[in-house]
């Protein structure tokens, strides 16, 4: 579960159109959220508040062997109006989980040709083509907003440990990230890491410097294929693409010890055209250490995800297999939206990346935020989304009584029937046309349109689902450990509790090696 400050940082990235999934360090974020999730230690209480749209504070108190705590502040130059407290926040936004990777279409305002830039300005800002003054004001506002900053600081007690973070947006595709830690127990009483990141739809370039060991690093991530928004406005881009392939590498050199480092990774993310279910596969290789790691993550249904990871070292021939899953529970006794409102909600795209404010439209009080969404979806999906509302229950949401029926394979038959009816209708209407090439192209376009509807509908169902809790389980065959984690909403609190069970090497009996519970409240 994210801390409130981490949640606000993600809101800042979402507000400023910064794509976290395009960062090389997040290439295994999905598998890590399901397999390597942290277990709480002891008792911890976190109380946070956002006094204004620009300023927030957080107080944390924990009891593990001794009582300690921390006090944190966060300030943003841009208003964080898309944030919520623990009472109203979507569980999918507050918890790290499966993420649909879309690095090719989530970023906006990319540095492309002047014709595209002119079209972008005219589509997004020019409501009156004859009002040149408004155009100039909007251009100036966009240029000013592209240089937003975020300041964060935390003080720990008892003791004198401090940590700070500064995010400075240089332009719309480049930012400077500085992290500092001051602790008397560290060498030279602290360390500092500086990141200079250039993030575009096509590639990522990152320069890193750490005062620890005078470490210098370079990271690159390249997305194969042509960007969808290369020659068209982002508002007119297709909502989904079936697959994304990303290849990245990182180079490290410790100047103090003269030690090099090298690793490379590949990520493949796609969606089933028949069910709309997404999956992600990754492969990471470290040739210096001889380590290979591969992961496979698939969202088996709207409320469940399965993940597996296999590690192998070709120097020592050591291997390990890790398995894990997450299972969401649906909220009960909720006031569902009307079918008409739900149909409108399913037609309205909520986000491009799940886990980053993508479920803001699940409650009536989030209506104003949903109205601000600038994403685009074709109005031709209205018939299909109304069919989904009828198919999946009242309000277009999946209720707790439909847990056993929330998988899409049994729901695809109406899609196939509609596809067949559409194909038959098209064939009858075009039977008098002597040009067979036109018929073939039209059938291809029809299939592509229905495939896009399937993937869009599945994502909308995930976004519209109102979850109350999630259970995560992971195990490792080599370590012989089982990790259990429950996260959910209790009244106005977000609660996270879990345990790690391991085999005692002496008695060969299972025992709790770690246990804790966290309470978080924010308003």
From Swiss-Prot:
Its biological purpose: Component of the ERMES/MDM complex, which serves as a molecular tether to connect the endoplasmic reticulum and mitochondria. Components of this complex are involved in the control of mitochondrial shape and protein biogenesis and may function in phospholipid exchange. MDM10 is involved in the late assembly steps of the general translocase of the mitochondrial outer membrane (TOM complex). Functions in the TOM40-specific route of the assembly of outer membrane beta-barrel proteins, including the association of TOM40 with the receptor TOM22 and small TOM proteins.
Name of the molecule in the record: Mitochondrial distribution and morphology protein 10
Compositionally biased residues, Low complexity: 428-440
Superkingdom of the source species: Eukaryota
Domain free text: Lacks alpha-helical transmembrane segments, suggesting that it resides in the membrane via beta-sheet conformations similar to those predicted for other outer membrane proteins and porin.
Polar residues bias: start-end ranges: 352-362
Subunit comment: Component of the ER-mitochondria encounter structure (ERMES) or MDM complex, composed of MMM1, MDM10, MDM12 and MDM34. Associates with the mitochondrial outer membrane sorting assembly machinery SAM(core) complex.
GO aspect biological process, one term: establishment of mitochondrion localization
């Amino acid at each position: 579960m994210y801390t409130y400050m981490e949640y606000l940082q993600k809101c800042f990235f979402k507000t400023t159109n910064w794509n976290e999934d395009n960062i090389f360090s997040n290439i295994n974020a999905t598998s890590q959220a399901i397999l390597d999730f942290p277990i709480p230690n002891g008792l911890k209480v976190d109380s946070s508040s956002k006094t204004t749209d620009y300023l927030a504070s957080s107080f944390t108190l924990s009891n593990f062997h001794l009582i300690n705590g921390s006090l944190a502040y966060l300030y943003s130059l841009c208003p964080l109006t898309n944030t919520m407290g623990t009472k109203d926040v979507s569980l999918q936004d507050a918890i790290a989980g499966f993420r649909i990777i879309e690095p090719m279409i989530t970023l906006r305002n990319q540095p492309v040709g002047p014709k595209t830039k002119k079209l972008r300005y005219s589509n997004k800002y020019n409501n009156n083509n004859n009002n040149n003054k408004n155009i100039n004001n909007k251009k100036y506002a966009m240029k000013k907003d592209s240089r937003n900053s975020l300041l964060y600081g935390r003080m720990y007690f008892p003791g004198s440990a401090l940590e700070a973070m500064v995010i400075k947006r240089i332009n719309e595709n480049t930012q400077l990230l500085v992290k500092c830690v001051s602790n008397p127990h560290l060498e030279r009483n602290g360390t500092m890491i500086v990141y200079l990141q250039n993030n575009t739809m096509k590639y990522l370039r990152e320069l890193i410097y750490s005062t620890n060991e005078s470490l210098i690093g370079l990271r690159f991530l390249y997305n194969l294929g042509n960007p969808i928004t290369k020659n068209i406005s982002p508002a007119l881009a297709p909502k989904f693409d079936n697959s994304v392939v990303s290849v990245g590498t990182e180079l490290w050199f410790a100047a103090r010890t003269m030690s090099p480092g090298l690793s490379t990774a590949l990520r493949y993310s796609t969606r089933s055209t028949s069910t709309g279910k997404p999956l992600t596969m990754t492969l990471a290789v470290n040739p210096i250490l001889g380590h290979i790691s591969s992961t496979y993550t698939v969202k088996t249904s709207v409320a469940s995800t399965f993940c597996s990871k296999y590690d192998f070292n070709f120097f020592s021939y050591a291997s390990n297999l890790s398995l894990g899953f997450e299972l969401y529970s649906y909220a009960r006794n909720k006031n569902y939206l009307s079918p008409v409102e739900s149909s409108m909600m399913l037609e309205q795209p909520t986000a491009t990346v799940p886990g980053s404010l993508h479920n803001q439209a699940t409650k009536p009080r989030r209506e104003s935020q949903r109205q601000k969404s600038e994403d685009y979806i074709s109005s031709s999906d209205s018939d299909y989304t109304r069919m989904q509302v009828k198919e999946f229950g009242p309000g277009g949401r999946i209720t707790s009584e439909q847990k056993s029926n929330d998988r899409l394979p049994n729901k695809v038959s109406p899609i196939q029937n509609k596809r067949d009816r559409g194909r038959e209708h098209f064939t009858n209407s075009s039977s008098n046309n002597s040009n067979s090439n036109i018929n073939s192209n039209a059938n291809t376009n029809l299939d592509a349109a229905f495939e896009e509807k399937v993937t869009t509908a599945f994502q909308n169902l995930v976004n519209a689902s109102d979850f109350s809790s999630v259970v995560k389980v992971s195990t490792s065959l080599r370590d012989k450990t089982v990790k259990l984690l429950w996260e959910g909403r209790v009244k106005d609190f977000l609660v996270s509790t879990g345990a790690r069970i391991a085999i005692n090497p002496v008695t060969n009996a299972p025992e709790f090696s770690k246990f804790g519970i966290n309470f978080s409240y924010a308003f």
